[in-house]
Amino acid sequence: MKILVTAFDPFGGESVNPSYEVLKNLKDNIEGAEIIKLQVPTAFYVSVEKAIEKIKEVNPDAVLSIGQAGGRYDISVERVAINIDDARIPDNMGQQPIDIPIDPEGPPAYFATIPIKEIVEAIKKENLPASVSNSAGTYVCNHLMYGILNYIHKNKLNIKAGFIHIPYLPEQVLEKPNTPYMSLSDMVKAIETAIKVIVKAMA
């Protein structure tokens, strides 16, 4: 079994992106599944292109994308990706789509096909905060989640896919008073726990 895990590069003036730091620290094999790691740029269109290229190359059984959601307190397992880009800031390639459909011919939304409730409960059993999120936003994270699910749907592929948002790292909030954060080791544990649930669900 192969699980493709994607993460983003830093954006919005940050020097690190916790998703990529987590990605680098994931085990290469979890519950017998090979973990394939891919960094994608925080860029609307290129992020999906890079992910699809890798999906074609490795034919994974599941794709789990991770992204930073600065300001969130917990591990947020996304339920749904919506068919709209509405960027409050430009992406890393200077693109700033406002109220633009991701795919004008696509459905309004896609639901994650990974077991979101089971993932949340498993992370909580590790004594880490987690919840189901009903909005992945309208920036690059939502765009990537929608783009991957759209590609899988259109090509009738038997691949599960979903997205998890994670908080800031401690070093990112030194100048951001009263902003939540989580340690790297806890976030790695949470994502590895999520992957274990995904693997077991497909076994």
From Swiss-Prot:
It is found in: Cytoplasm. It is an enzyme of class 3 (hydrolase). GO terms for molecular function: pyroglutamyl-peptidase activity. One of its GO terms (cellular component) is cytosol. PANTHER family: PROTEASE FAMILY C15 PYROGLUTAMYL-PEPTIDASE I-RELATED, PYROGLUTAMYL-PEPTIDASE I. This is Pyrrolidone-carboxylate peptidase 1. Its EC number is 3.4.19.3. InterPro entries: Peptidase_C15, Peptidase_C15-like, Peptidase_C15-like_sf, PGP-I_bact-type, PGPEP1_Cys_AS, PGPEP1_Glu_AS. It holds the Pfam family Peptidase_C15. GO terms for biological process: proteolysis. Homotetramer. The active site is at E78, C141, H165. Removes 5-oxoproline from various penultimate amino acid residues except L-proline. Belongs to the peptidase C15 family. It comes from Caldanaerobacter subterraneus subsp. tengcongensis (strain DSM 15242 / JCM 11007 / NBRC 100824 / MB4). It catalyses: Release of an N-terminal pyroglutamyl group from a polypeptide, the second amino acid generally not being Pro. Coiled coil: none annotated. Keywords: Cytoplasm, Hydrolase, Protease, Thiol protease. SUPFAM superfamilies: Pyrrolidone carboxyl peptidase (pyroglutamate aminopeptidase) (SSF53182). Signal peptide: none annotated.
